[in-house]
């Protein structure tokens, strides 16, 4: 029960996004616990028979992962011709994940390995992160010259890591977060 005793969920604001722009179900907005869980446990071994680890895994799925999916879906819904994709990778190869990510891309770009990402990150930039990116690993279909060109354009248009630090979360709600993410997406 460590996870539920340590964190005070009474301060979590529940907000219904009901503007014409972002019709939504009832969903808590991100809070510091959604970021802290990755800072505290990201990269650590997950023991499937350990009750504490099971609770942490459930928390990650129910809160930061669900909120990331909601964020991405709302952004994709706001951009004609875009869709989102998210794998529920709250743990990888027996270790807690370092982040929650969802991809948003034009339907026609699905197999081009170029996309926007939104989510919680604890590794490079701690907080909520949104950016234009591309598949950088060996599985990428992009040739090296295209990867270099993508990097150049991302820097040139300031589409790299945009971070909202945990200390700034009180300045945001779903509408504001979705709007700034959509604005970034529309610059491409």
List PLM regions with ranges.
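Charge-rich, low-complexity N-terminal segments
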Residues: 2-113
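Residue-level detector of short, conserved catalytic/binding motifs and their immediate flanks
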Residues: 114-116, 128
């Amino acid at each position: 029960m460590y996870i539920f005793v340590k964190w005070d969920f009474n301060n979590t604001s529940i907000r219904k996004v009901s503007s014409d722009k972002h019709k939504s179900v009832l969903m808590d907005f991100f809070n510091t616990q959604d970021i802290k869980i990755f800072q505290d446990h990201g990269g650590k071994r997950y023991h499937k028979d350990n009750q504490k680890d099971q609770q942490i895994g459930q928390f990650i799925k129910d809160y930061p992962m669900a909120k990331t999916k909601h964020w991405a879906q709302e952004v994709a819904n706001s951009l004609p011709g875009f869709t989102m994709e998210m794998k529920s990778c709250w743990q990888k190869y027996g270790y807690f994940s370092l982040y929650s990510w969802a991809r948003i891309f034009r339907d026609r770009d699905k197999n081009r390995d170029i996309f926007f990402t939104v989510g919680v990150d604890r590794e490079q930039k701690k907080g909520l992160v949104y950016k234009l990116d591309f598949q950088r690993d060996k599985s990428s279909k992009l040739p090296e010259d295209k990867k270099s060109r993508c990097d150049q354009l991302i820097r040139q248009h300031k589409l790299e890591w945009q971070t909202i630090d945990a200390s700034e979360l009180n300045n945001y709600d779903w509408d504001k977060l979705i709007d700034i993410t959509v604005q970034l997406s529309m610059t491409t």
